[in-house]
Amino acid sequence: MLWTEETMRQVTGRSSKNSTIKASIRLASGGRFFSASMVENVAEEGDIVVTIDTPRATLVTAQILSELSAETILAINGQNLLSSEVAVVSDAIDNKLAVIALDKKAHDLLVEKFSERLHFTSPLLSTTHSDKNAFIIETADSSTYYLRLYNNGLQLAEALDLASEDELLYYVANILDIAATDIPIYINSEEKKVIRLLKKYYKVICE
């Protein structure tokens, strides 16, 4: 979700440097699983951008982050940090930053290995199709969803943990109501069941 300083309501998205290494880490079970094996195989030079796949994330503007701590932002978003978690913040893209709940052990391992080379990001910050009016649905697994609505700019972004098909259809229908116009729906998912479900009710473009 994107929080705007004007409304403080949940609404809701970095340019890569040269020699930047990008890695994607899926933190299953709500962000509490981390495999350290990949860390030892990463090159010793260049920035490290780690994408954290977890629904325990939200978007804010730089202004909001200057007024509230990352921990407070997650708490207000209904994502109180567990004792085993820390809050991390991404670099900014178009004045938007991701605030993410991350397992402490994973965080400490990454910081110890990469220190100032380390940058975090979230799929919520993806800019795919940001140049058009579109609704984008991405999945990390069968229950972790990233929903982004572009309607004359980023209007809404959600990182969600959905337990059922009905929940997914509820959110999709509500976001399309927010759009209040016909827009293309793009889906990026390896979950064939999800694709079949959405195709049953909507015209979707698979990527």
Named regions from a protein language model:
Residues 1-207:
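Hydrophobic/aromatic-enriched cytosolic interaction surfaces used to assemble or bind macromolecules
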